[in-house]
Curated annotation (Swiss-Prot):
Gene3D superfamilies: 3.10.450.50, 6.10.140.620, Phosphorylase Kinase, domain 1, Transferase(Phosphotransferase) domain 1. ATP binds at residues 20-28, 43. One of its GO terms (molecular function) is calmodulin binding. The lineage of its organism: Eukaryota, Metazoa, Chordata, Craniata, Vertebrata. This is Calcium/calmodulin-dependent protein kinase type II subunit beta. Calcium/calmodulin-dependent protein kinase that functions autonomously after Ca(2+)/calmodulin-binding and autophosphorylation, and is involved in dendritic spine and synapse formation, neuronal plasticity and regulation of sarcoplasmic reticulum Ca(2+) transport in skeletal muscle. In neurons, plays an essential structural role in the reorganization of the actin cytoskeleton during plasticity by binding and bundling actin filaments in a kinase-independent manner. It comes from Bos taurus (Bovine). Its EC number is 2.7.11.17. It catalyses: L-seryl-[protein] + ATP = O-phospho-L-seryl-[protein] + ADP + H(+); L-threonyl-[protein] + ATP = O-phospho-L-threonyl-[protein] + ADP + H(+). Belongs to the protein kinase superfamily. CAMK Ser/Thr protein kinase family. CaMK subfamily. Autophosphorylation of Thr-287 following activation by Ca(2+)/calmodulin. Phosphorylation of Thr-287 locks the kinase into an activated state. Residues 354-369 have a biased composition (Polar residues). Pfam families: CaMKII_AD (PF08332), Pkinase (PF00069). The keyword Phosphoprotein applies.
């Protein structure tokens, strides 16, 4: 009887130590190679939990990382498969994030920013020369090799990276992080290497003043700003930045990717290659202070999002301004975090770009000064809307959180479309409701007295005879939404729905139902194909 030989090369050659990162399918631990005593970071992926597509994604990331050998890129030293686990052995990067290091410095100038962007561009140039587009350049992926002064900047996390042939432009899927996405990606046009240069432009802008060039509470408005290239250089902070620095930013943030500066050209820009005579040496204390708040927002946002999602609440056009009812504990936790966010974010000095009327492009989406920027309440994590790209998983060796971003993005879509459906119900808008529902929608609901209802006619009756005639305010809160993603084009959501309304006698009432909805995506659009609602037959719940 033949015996199966199991590979134990990692176990034989490396000694594992403490955890330094953790995620959905993997953990990162410090390790030492026994024969040399050298330290590394081992990303350990539990392959028993991966789908075939996830395996392809892992192979692509390892293949790309093996290609890249540069002093400004976190290097992959080994890739080993053992039974049930895959080990990626990276540089052990101990200096933390570049942006966190900058705010701890006693002195920081335009010349320092020039040196930082030069190293980032050197890494990007190497990627592009090797036919690799990173697609997720952002502060979280810019690390320092060590805590030593003058340590090298290291580009990390190639979980979204793609391979391209030469200057090939194609649609590789909607991937990246909202504030750093290029106009061509947002327009869903063919793209390639220039997307990395656009992100470098955003990073350089932040390096110089401590806040981003594009921001809005509303992600749609944020995307409109980016597509229009609507940024500016407001006073007084930009008055002390040299014209050469602004010129480089303008060339990086050029809307047309064909006209955007390339990595090798940017490295030859006078502000980069002649920094000692061109870049200002003046200490930029205001930038450091703004950057502290920018960093704080990045760290805080995840906690806010997690807490707020637990009691996700929204209101429709005819609602009252009274807050939705929620559990005291959850409400307290959420409000505590929101107050923390406000204290960090509501002032220009806190790193929020002041909104001015003089924008580079008149199509800029305007926001009132003092409102929360998207980093506070909008997710600034990586998003993927194209299943071809597989699951985004941050390289744990970069000290970032690993998440199944593809699944996460789809779950957010399902919660959002469920909100839209309930909003249509509360508005009595049958047309909007019918667009979201499958024509053959099936349901078990109290109004049907336990019978299975199929089609839209049953629901149309309530819209035409009750909901459309209801002029009283309605306020709905979704509590504890749980989404199960079922393959690429199906999902199920379960939640508790609280509805506040005014009864016929003018008294405030609250009703509760437990609901489950099944969603199916057809032609790129999610449609509700079935729902099950508990409770007594009380309008206006359905």
């Amino acid at each position: 009887m033949a015996t199966t030989v199991t590979c134990t090369r990692f176990t034989d050659e490396y000694q594992l130590y403490e955890d330094i990162g953790k995620g959905a399918f993997s953990v990162v631990r410090r390790c030492v190679k026994l024969c040399t005593g050298h330290e590394y970071a081992a990303k350990i992926i539990n392959t028993k939990k991966l789908s075939a597509r996830d395996h392809q994604k892992l192979e692509r990331e390892a293949r790309i990382c093996r290609l890249l050998k540069h002093s400004n890129i976190v290097r992959l030293h080994d890739s080993i498969s053992e039974e049930g686990f895959h080990y990626l052995v990276f540089d052990l990067v101990t200096g933390g994030e570049l942006f966190e290091d900058i705010v701890a410095r006693e002195y920081y100038s335009e010349a320092d920013a020039s040196h930082c962007i030069q190293q980032i561009l050197e890494a990007v140039l190497h990627c592009h020369q090797m036919g690799v587009v990173h697609r997720d350049l952002k502060p979280e992926n810019l690390l320092l090799a060590s805590k030593c002064k003058g340590a090298a900047v290291k580009l990390a996390d190639f979980g979204l990276a793609i391979e391209v042939q030469g200057d090939q432009q194609a649609w590789f899927g909607f991937a990246g992080t909202p504030g750093y996405l290029s106009p061509e990606v947002l327009r869903k046009e063919a793209y390639g290497k220039p997307v990395d240069i656009w992100a470098c432009g955003v990073i350089l802008y932040i390096l110089l003043v401590g806040y981003p060039p594009f921001w809005d509470e509303d992600q749609h408005k944020l995307y409109q700003q980016i597509k229009a290239g609507a940024y500016d250089f407001p006073s007084p902070e930009w008055d002390t930045v040299t014209p050469e620095a602004k010129n480089l930013i303008n060339q990086m943030l050029t809307i047309n990717p064909a006209k955007r500066i390339m990595a090798h050209e940017a490295l030859k820009h006078p502000w980069v290659c002649q920094r000692s005579t061109v870049a200002s040496m003046m200490h930029r204390q205001e930038t450091v202070e703004c950057l502290k708040k920018f960093n704080a927002r990045r760290k805080l946002k995840g906690a806010i999002l997690t807490t707020m999602l637990a009691t996700r609440n929204f209101s429709v056009g005819r609602q009252t301004t009274a807050p939705a009812t929620m559990s005291t504990a959850a409400s307290g936790a959420t409000m505590g975090l929101v107050e923390q966010a406000k204290s960090l974010l509501n002032k220009k000095a806190d790193g929020v770009k002041p909104q001015t009327n003089s924008t580079k492009n008149s199509a800029a989406a305007t926001s009132p000064k003092g409102t929360l920027p998207p980093a506070a309440l909008e997710p600034q994590t990586t998003v993927i809307h194209n299943p071809v790209d597989g699951i985004k998983e941050s390289s744990d060796s970069t000290h970032t959180t690993i998440e199944d971003e593809d699944t996460k993005a789809r779950k957010q879509e399902i919660i959002k479309i469920t909100e839209q459906l309930i909003e249509a119900v509360n508005n009595g808008d049958f047309e909007a409701y019918a667009k979201i529902c499958d024509p053959g929608l099936t349901s078990f609901e109290p109004e049907a007295l336990g019978n299975l209802v199929e089609g839209m006619d049953f629901h149309r009756f309530y819209f035409e005879n009750l909901l459309a005639k209801n002029s009283k305010p309605i306020h709905t809160t979704i509590l504890n939404p749980h989404v199960h993603v079922i393959g690429e084009d199906a999902a199920c959501i379960a939640y508790i729905r609280l509805t506040q309304y005014i009864d016929g006698q003018g008294r405030p009432r609250t009703s509760q139902s437990e609901e489950t909805r099944v969603w199916h995506r057809r032609d790129g659009k999610w449609q509700n194909v079935h729902f099950h609602c508990s409770g007594a037959p009380v309008a206006p719940l359905q």
